[in-house]
Amino acid sequence: MWQQAIGDALGITARNLKKFGDRFPHVSDGSNKYVLNDNTDWTDGFWSGILWLCYEYTGDEQYREGAVRTVASFRERLDRFENLDHHDIGFLYSLSAKAQWIVEKDESARKLALDAADVLMRRWRADAGIIQAWGPKGDPENGGRIIIDCLLNLPLLLWAGEQTGDPEYRRVAEAHALKSRRFLVRGDDSSYHTFYFDPENGNAIRGGTHQGNTDGSTWTRGQAWGIYGFALNSRYLGNADLLETAKRMARHFLARVPEDGVVYWDFEVPQEPSSYRDSSASAITACGLLEIASQLDESDPERQRFIDAAKTTVTALRDGYAERDDGEAEGFIRRGSYHVRGGISPDDYTIWGDYYYLEALLRLERGVTGYWYERGR
């Protein structure tokens, strides 16, 4: 059922390997070509993750060789501390170094992932009880700020805690996850993109947005980060409240999916042709639904409901948004949005959308769960 879609992604990736060389794709800019960078952006781990997924599925050395080169690049980036003053270290190193460890049990990759976890730990602000999202400590705008994306960065810390036996990684990750649950998720199970706290004492100030439509609206990719992020943290922490939050957010999301199965970029905007979609939000959510289902008993009626919803979502992406391996396209799925209000790639390829689309396909086809936790955990 999914093999043709996976084959298209494999073919596109093989071509991209030759085109991109040692550079990393981020988003497209209105064309069918990716804008590349030299491993300086927050999204670069997704390219590495795609290559590891392709290698796991095929055993083809071209994907492995490309993936190993990316890990070497991430080692250099950490040594230089280049554009790492943010919480997305988890995205960057879970899908590169930690992926190599999971696939090959390479000790140097494991050490690199642990070193990256230590860098992420430096962003813990004990007085506020948060992992600061962006900027240096004491930043006047961002010093007490969290964003919902961070839930996908916490698995790097939780994995590091299991690998080393040091409870501090888990303590920090759990504290941040629980504070995110309390303040980022609204009473109706929608979500804020970002929340501000007093950096000196952790008192709540206000919720807001950076990439959503309004402070009070629900940015669909943020909701998707919450669905998958709370589910992943539940797997590590065994916290039923986190899993229940993921389920509630998933129900909220699914109740607002338009007829063709792929969401618009914000739940507040009109569902009409002139509004932008965000295919990446749907791809992330598909992975989150499958992760939730994997933690439910087979007797739970919602388990199959979430699996069916994930299949419906991936089918909608495959049939209405996915590119075919025709020699031209560089992305897997069209109509992703990066920053609509900012006018940055509002209707384009996104490398994270491509990664989660492929992860969802491989979860459905082979049970491959990505690189957020050890296999068989």
Curated annotation (Swiss-Prot):
Q: Which GO terms describe its cellular component?
A: cytoplasm
How the protein is activated or inhibited is described as: Partially inhibited by divalent metal ions such as calcium, copper, iron and mercury.
Q: Where in the cell is it found?
A: Cytoplasm
Q: Which GO terms describe its biological process?
A: polysaccharide catabolic process
Domain of life per record: Bacteria
The record, for SUPFAM superfamilies, names: Six-hairpin glycosidases
Identify the EC number(s).
3.2.1.179
Q: Where's it mainly located?
A: cytoplasm
Thermal response of activity: Optimum temperature is 45 degrees Celsius.
The record's GO molecular-function terms, alphabetically, read:
chondroitin hydrolase activity
Known catalysed reaction(s)? beta-D-Delta(4)-GlcA-(1->4)-beta-D-Glc-(1->4)-alpha-L-Rha-(1->3)-D-Glc + H2O = beta-D-Glc-(1->4)-alpha-L-Rha-(1->3)-D-Glc + 5-dehydro-4-deoxy-D-glucuronate
Kindly give the InterPro entries that the UniProt entry links to this protein: 6-hairpin_glycosidase_sf, 6hp_glycosidase-like_sf, Glyco_hydro_88, UG_Glycosaminoglycan_Hydrolase
Report keywords, A-Z.
Carbohydrate metabolism, Cytoplasm, Glycosidase, Hydrolase, Polysaccharide degradation
Q: What is the effect of changing D149N?
A: Large decrease in activity, but no significant conformational change
pH effects: Optimum pH is 6.0-6.5.
Q: Which residues form the active site?
A: D88, D149
How is the subunit organization of this protein annotated in UniProt? Answer: Monomer.
Role of this protein? Catalyzes the hydrolysis of oligosaccharides with unsaturated glucuronyl residues at the non-reducing terminal, to a sugar or an amino sugar, and an unsaturated D-glucuronic acid (GlcA), which is nonenzymatically converted immediately to alpha-keto acid.
Family to which this protein belongs: Belongs to the glycosyl hydrolase 88 family.
- PANTHER family assigned: HYDROLASE, PUTATIVE (AFU_ORTHOLOGUE AFUA_7G05090)-RELATED
Name this protein carries in UniProt: Unsaturated glucuronyl hydrolase
Q: Which organism is it from?
A: Bacillus sp. (strain GL1)
Its taxonomic path starts at: Bacteria, Bacillati, Bacillota, Bacilli, Bacillales
